[in-house]
Amino acid sequence: MDPAPTLAAELWRTPYLGGGGGGGGGGRGLEAAASGVTEQSNGSRGGGGGGGAGRRRQREAPALEDDSSRIVSTSGGGGGGQDLTDSEAKRFKASKSSGDNSSLRTEAETDSRNASKSGDQNPPPPEPPKQDYIHVRARRGQATDSHSLAERARREKISERMKILQDLVPGCNKVIGKASVLDEIINYIQALQRQVEFLSMKLEAVNAHVNNGIEAFPPKDFGAQVYNTAPGLTFDPQTPREYAQGSTPSEWLHMQIGGTYERVT
C-alpha cells in the first residue's frame, strides 16, 4: 500500500479538528501538507513507483490545493475570513437579484412581443351596420323607432288642438292633465247642446203662438184695429198689402217688437 495517500488523509483531517482557534496556523499546516504531498508524489514518480499512480497523485494535488484554500477562507477564526464570506454572499445575492430582474425583463419583453404579434394577426371586428332612420333622443312617453317622427308630429298636433280647446272653454286652464281637460271640454259641450235644445223648443212655441194669433184675425180687419197693449203705448197699423208682399210671421213679429212701438208722453 502506498503511504502517500494515507499521509495526505491524516494531514487533511487536522484543520477540521483544530476548529476556529487555529486561525493562520491551520492554514500554514495545510500549505505544508500540500507541499509534502506534492514532494512525495514527485519522488514516487521519480523513483519509478508506477506511471498510473503518479498521474493520479498529480491530478489530486491541485484539487487538494483548491479545497485547502477554501477551508482556510471558511475555517479561519479572524475577521478577515468573515469579511470575505460576507462580501461573497452579498455579491452572490446581488448577482442573483440582477439575474432575476433580467429574466423578468426578458419575460415581459417576450409577452409584449407575443401580444403585439397576436394583435397584428387578429383583425379588428367589423363595424355594426348603420341604421336607416335618424335616431332622435326620446323624451318621456315618446318612441324612437323608424315611425317615431310621424308619431311625434301627430302628438304635437294633438297637443296644439288641446291648447286651443283649453283657451275656448272657460276655467279649463286651471285643470292639470289631459284626461281631466278632456272631461271639462266634454261637459262644456254637453251644456251648450242642452242650451241650444232649450232655445230651439222655446222658439218653436213662440212661432206657434204667433201663427195662431194671425189666423184669428182676417186680413181685411187687420189694418183697422188698434192694439193698446200697455197704457201710454200706441200700435201703428200695418196694411195687409205690405204683409202679403212676402214677409214671414217671424219677421213680422220682429218688426213689430223692434221698431213699431212708441212711448206716448
Swiss-Prot record:
Chief site of localization: nucleus
Any single GO BP term: regulation of DNA-templated transcription
Pfam families assigned to the protein according to its UniProt record, in alphabetical order: HLH (PF00010)
SUPFAM superfamilies with a match to the protein in the record: HLH, helix-loop-helix DNA-binding domain (SSF47459)
Single GO molecular function: DNA binding
CDD domains: bHLH_AtBPE_like (cd18919)
Keywords, sorted A to Z: DNA-binding, Nucleus, Transcription, Transcription regulation
Keyword S-adenosyl-L-methionine: no
Family the entry assigns: Belongs to the bHLH protein family.
Stored PANTHER family: STEROL REGULATORY ELEMENT-BINDING PROTEIN, TRANSCRIPTION FACTOR BHLH089
Subunit structure: Interacts with RSS3.
Known function: Transcription factor that may regulate jasmonate-regulated genes.
Name of the featured protein: Transcription factor BHLH089
